[in-house]
UniProtKB/Swiss-Prot annotation:
Region of interest (Disordered), residue spans: 426-445
Signal peptide: none
Designated name of the protein: Alanine--tRNA ligase
PROSITE patterns, per the entry: AA_TRNA_LIGASE_II_ALA
Classification via InterPro entries: aa-tRNA-synth_II/BPL/LPL, Ala-tRNA-lgiase_IIc, Ala-tRNA-ligase_IIc_anticod-bd, Ala-tRNA-synth_IIc_core, Ala-tRNA-synth_IIc_N, Ala-tRNA_ligase, Ala_tRNA_ligase_euk/bac, DHHA1_dom
E.C. designation(s): 6.1.1.7
Gene it is expressed from: alaS
Family indicated by similarity: Belongs to the class-II aminoacyl-tRNA synthetase family.
GO BP field: alanyl-tRNA aminoacylation
Keywords: Aminoacyl-tRNA synthetase, ATP-binding, Cytoplasm, Ligase, Metal-binding, Nucleotide-binding, Protein biosynthesis, RNA-binding, tRNA-binding, Zinc
Catalytic function, reaction form: tRNA(Ala) + L-alanine + ATP = L-alanyl-tRNA(Ala) + AMP + diphosphate
Function: Catalyzes the attachment of alanine to tRNA(Ala) in a two-step reaction: alanine is first activated by ATP to form Ala-AMP and then transferred to the acceptor end of tRNA(Ala). Also edits incorrectly charged Ser-tRNA(Ala) and Gly-tRNA(Ala) via its editing domain.
Membrane-spanning ranges: none
């Protein structure tokens, strides 16, 4: 029975039992930022079990996409080494929401397995919770299972809980005995591949209290799950999930790419590598098609680890090129009928994966070289443990996830100091945290504050106005600055990428200039860098002035705040446009919003083309021209914000009450920053830069409002000046004429270089001592005065063509920089084995430089002109030795 038929027969069976067939939820949870990946069929029904949601149906069945690659439910380390663990798998399941219960769940499971699929009854075992007599009785009286095949187990194996508190209940599992003689009773629940769990039937009937008590739920539910790959192996008579038709297309593609056949043996390193690559290709295809992106944090880092792990295993197949992106199409072809998103996003997923592979392969070989050196060092010291600091260096410098280093170390017979690695990781985080804290305190030392109130919190009034009367509740001094905390303030403190407000605080005696505002816990720290003494009508040192508790008037610089607000609202427009233009995989990875400009980092797999940049810029300006788009701000419960469509990303921390900024019809985001009232106030949006920040992360820099206008006016004036210089009309595009001038210049420069080379060649030919004949081979090694690097190259090429059996090195210097050009004729390379690339590296050492190239021609540079004669001598002697040998 084919895997596709097995899946369909499961769904058809439950349609016959009046179940609604629901679509698989994405593997990226849409409304649960606490969960990395969907890891069970019940995830999408979690709200029902928690009595926070309902469905229009009371019976459901589906095949759910699942990923288990991190945290408690983590199969990553076992993948490839056994027959049945995967990071991606399908979970077949059926559910009852307050409808049927134990009897139907048990009898229907038995009917499907033994009547429809015709699995041998004598090979099946049922486990029940040790005091669940009801389930035991149903198995005994309502099915034809052998009574001695009903086994009782305790909490560890047969009691399901969602968490430390909440919905829970006993479960009944169905296992199959795969031992040759049917003697697997003792292997049930022993994590043995010869007695595997097929189906878990969970009966949710209790609510676990904080004190551990179990209270009956008002409604009882059924939640079942069956591993699709496992049941396919059983139905197809295979001893391994990987031997089924689920994986065969992937192995065929890997064989086609690498030339390595699958099926040598269970423990063969190349078979293990092929299983890992096949599994990881599925995981990446499904995760990325559901909107995930590789990154350095959260679920994105898990995916990056998986990809890099697979690339490391590809080396065991002798394959050193990107491979996973070639498998994306295979996954889509074999599973796209059931999960159409695989085909819909196939090209985009392949591009993302390929970009990630190419990025890591740049450092992989160097990292492996460093790792091998560390292995030699450890063995030389008589140790068997790789230091945590070394593992951290591989992670920090070469992008080696810790589990990849541990895997490589295990293959080398070594262990890795995990505690030491974690210590280095924590030290790095602590340093970063301390740097952030110092900035938030405005540079003040810990404990240097003088407080005038038991409450240190600041009330922010800056959403509604830019001025406020307030009281000073805290003072500190840092170097030449004065730091103030007020009980209320209109100054926005830096957070969410928006820089802190600037402005003034009036005390009566002093006018204090605030040049930054930082947030330290609940306190807003106003950084004062200049002070004006109103009484003496002169400037004062802010670190020395006498300021104590009292009333003040705080006012934000209106012009700067408005410029910041234009830039901040523009980032929301930009984010929405990027998601619409490039795809839903685009997620904000960072931002900087200040009065001068905006910077927006986002997940994307490739450099934006000029056409894409133009399209994004044009779309943002189209949004701005919709001047009727008035922003809406509201503080709402987090769940309501998510329901409204506001984006929430894994790892972000949100309070129960969140601020939602909505640009109607365009964008809904959780954001605590300040914004314009109407998008028309932004005026103009102009992209000034697009670049790479990290693998899979791009950056756009842009200007808005007056800054964007000034940039465009400056560019217009410069273009006008260029047209005048070229004597062109206003309507004529200057690009073609400039290109023609540059092409003409390049041609003239080439002619000049050739003329210089010919002069140099004549000079060398006229100097009898320049060309040495050794056993018929012409050798030249000379310092040439006044020649530039281009002239040296042309002269070397001419000498190479003029003398059929020859080798030479030409050197010159200008402004302390040395240029070298070496050559070897075709006959010198083939008949004598002369290699200009190797020889120039030896010679370059004399001028404190380096270089290289091919055997026929090579170049180098250096910074020691005094060593040029030595370089010539080294080259000449080396060639003599080769020729005479």
């Amino acid at each position: 029975m084919k895997s596709s038929d097995i899946r369909q027969s499961f769904l058809d069976f439950f349609v016959g039992k009046s179940h609604a067939i629901v679509r698989s939820a994405p593997v990226i949870p849409a409304d649960d930022p606490t969960l990395l990946f969907t890891n069970a069929g019940m995830n999408q029904f979690k709200d029902v079990f928690l009595a926070k949601g309902t469905r229009s149906y009371s019976r459901a069945a589906d095949t759910q996409k699942c990923i288990r690659a991190s945290g408690k439910h983590n199969d990553l380390e076992d993948v490839g080494r056994d027959t049945y663990h995967h990071t991606f798998f399908e979970m077949l399941g059926n559910w009852s929401f307050g409808d049927y219960y134990k009897e139907e769940a048990i009898t229907w499971a038995w009917e499907l397995l033994t009547v429809v699929w015709k699995l041998p009854e004598e090979r099946l075992y049922a486990t029940v919770y040790h005091d669940d007599d009801e389930s035991f009785r149903i198995w005994e009286e309502k099915t034809s299972i052998r009574p001695d095949h009903i086994l009782r187990f305790g909490d560890k194996d047969n009691f399901w809980e969602m968490g430390e508190t909440g919905p829970c209940g006993p479960c009944s599992e169905i296992h199959i005995d795969l031992t040759p003689d049917g003697s697997g009773r003792a292997l049930v629940n022993a994590d043995d591949p010869q007695a595997i769990e097929l189906w878990n039937l969970v009966f949710i009937q209790y609510d676990r209290q904080v004190d551990g008590r179990l209270e009956p739920l008002p409604q009882r539910h059924v939640d079942t799950g069956m591993g699709f790959e496992r049941v396919c192996a059983v139905m197809q008579g295979k001893s391994s999930n990987y031997d089924t038709d689920v994986f065969r297309p992937l192995f065929d593609t890997i064989t086609e790419l690498t030339g390595v056949e699958y099926g040598a043996s269970m423990h063969d390193p190349q078979d293990i590598a092929m299983r890992v690559i096949a599994d990881h290709a599925r995981t990446l295809s499904f995760a990325l098609s559901d909107g995930a992106m590789p990154s350095n944090e959260g679920r994105g880092y898990v995916l990056r680890r998986i990809l890099r792990r697979a690339l490391r295993y590809a080396k065991d197949l002798g394959y050193n090129k990107p491979i996973l992106h070639r498998l994306v199409a295979t996954v889509a072809d074999s599973m796209g009928d059931v999960f159409p998103e695989l085909r819909d996003r196939q090209d985009a997923v392949a591009r993302i994966v390929k970009a990630e592979e190419e990025s890591f392969l740049v450092t992989l070989d160097r990292g492996i070289e460093i790792f091998n050196g560390l292995v030699g060092k450890v063995r030389g010291e008589g140790s068997s443990t790789l230091e945590g600091e070394d593992a951290f260096k591989l992670y920090d410098t070469y992008g080696f996830p810790f589990d990849l280093t541990r895997l490589m170390a295990s293959s080398a017979g070594l262990q890795v100091d995990g505690e030491g690695f974690e210590r280095c990781m924590q030290e790095q985080k602590t340093r970063a945290r301390q740097d952030r804290r110092e900035k938030q305190r405005g540079g003040a030392e810990e404990g240097s504050w003088e407080w005038f109130s038991d409450l240190h919190a600041t009330e922010f009034t800056g959403y509604d106005g830019l001025e406020a009367d307030a009281s000073i509740i805290g003072i500190s001094r840092s170097k030449k600055n004065l730091l103030l905390v007020l009980d209320r303030t209109p100054f926005y403190a830096e957070s969410g990428g928006q820089t802190g407000d600037r402005g003034w605080i009036e005390t009566g005696e002093y006018r204090l200039e605030v040049t930054d505002t930082q947030k330290d816990g609940d306190s807003f720290v106003h950084v004062v860098t200049r002070a004006f003494d109103n009484v003496r009508d002169s400037e004062a040192d802010p670190a020395d002035i006498a300021v104590g508790p009292g009333r003040v008037h705080a006012s934000v610089d209106r012009k700067l705040r408005q410029a910041t607000e234009r830039n901040h609202t523009a980032t929301h427009l930009l984010h929405a446009v990027l998601r619409h233009t490039l795809g839903a995989h685009v997620q904000q990875k960072g931002s900087l919003v200040n009065p001068e400009r905006l910077r927006f980092d986002f997940s994307h797999f490739s450099k934006l083309t000029p056409e894409e940049i133009d399209a994004v810029e044009s779309a943002v300006n189209d949004c701005i021209r919709q001047a009727e788009a008035t922003l809406k701000h509201a503080d709402v419960p987090y769940d309501d914000a998510i329901t409204k469509g506001a984006l929430a990303f894994f790892g972000d921390k949100y309070a129960d009450l969140v601020r939602v900024v909505e640009i109607p019809g365009i964008s809904v985001e959780l954001c605590g920053g300040t914004h314009v009232d109407n998008v028309g106030q932004i005026g103009l949006f102009k992209i000034v830069g697009e670049s790479s920040v990290a693998a899979g992360v791009r950056r756009i820099e842009a200007l808005t409002g007056r800054a964007a206008e000034e940039l465009m006016w400056n560019e217009y004036r410069e273009l006008h000046d260029v047209r005048q210089l070229l004597k062109m009309k206003a309507e004529e595009p200057p690009a073609e004429k400039v290109a023609a001038i540059l092409e003409e210049r390049r041609a003239l420069e080439k002619q000049l270089a050739e003329l210089k080379a010919e002069v140099l060649l004549v000079k060398l030919q006229g100097d009898a001592s320049a060309l040495e004949d050794v056993c018929g081979c012409r050798i030249v090694a000379r310092v040439v005065d006044g020649a530039d690097a281009e002239g040296l190259r042309y002269a070397a090429q001419m000498l190479r063509q003029q003398f059929p059996l020859s080798a030479g090195l030409l050197c010159s210097s200008a402004e302390g920089k040395v240029s070298l050009a070496a050559f070897a004729s075709d006959r010198a390379v083939k008949e004598l084995g002369i290699d200009a690339g190797k020889l120039i590296r030896q010679a370059a050492a004399a001028v404190k430089g380096g270089g290289g190239g091919k055997a026929e021609f090579a170049t180098a540079g250096g910074k020691n002109p005094e060593g040029m004669e030595d370089a010539c001598r080294v080259f000449r002697e080396a060639v003599r030795c080769i020729v005479k040998a």
